[in-house]
Amino acid sequence: MKVTLDTNLLFEYWRDRPKKALVERLLALAANGDIGLAITARVREDIPDEPYASGINALDEIGVEETGSVTRLGNWVLGRDQLGSAGFEDFRLELESAWEEGDPKLPDWRDWDHLHAHMLQGRTVFLTWDGAMLRLREILDARFQIRVQTPEDFLIEIGTDDSQHGH
């Protein structure tokens, strides 16, 4: 199973926040070969500053692959990034043009790029705690077969949730 991590999972892990143990369980599953973990290269725009920027370069040491992203002027790497889907971009523009003051916030451009690259690479599930992405999970699944979940829901679904055992 090919799992893409959103940037907020990395911050939780690196900053020793309360949900760090969930990220550690995902890393253990990857170390066992049960899942493949990846981040998209757009994470470099999410995390431009030290000390976390250099942490991106060490992700492969903990079992997280860095995949390409969507080609975007000013943020494009030959041989890594790929052209986007017109249908996906049209969908994003539809949502943005329909958005009105007071509506729930939409994902920002980096979030859209993470989701878009995840879809183009045929990955299985995108894990995040970002409310803007989670609010769109049903429509993303219906229109593009992009499965967006919280790490908690994912771990329960694959049968590794041990919260009932006090962990």
Label each region the model flagged.
Residues 14-17, 101-107:
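Short, flexible loop segments at the rims of nucleotide/cofactor-binding pockets, characterized by
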Residues 65-105:
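Acidic catalytic patch
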Residues 53-72, 145-148:
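Active-site regions of enzymes building and remodeling cell-envelope glycoconjugates
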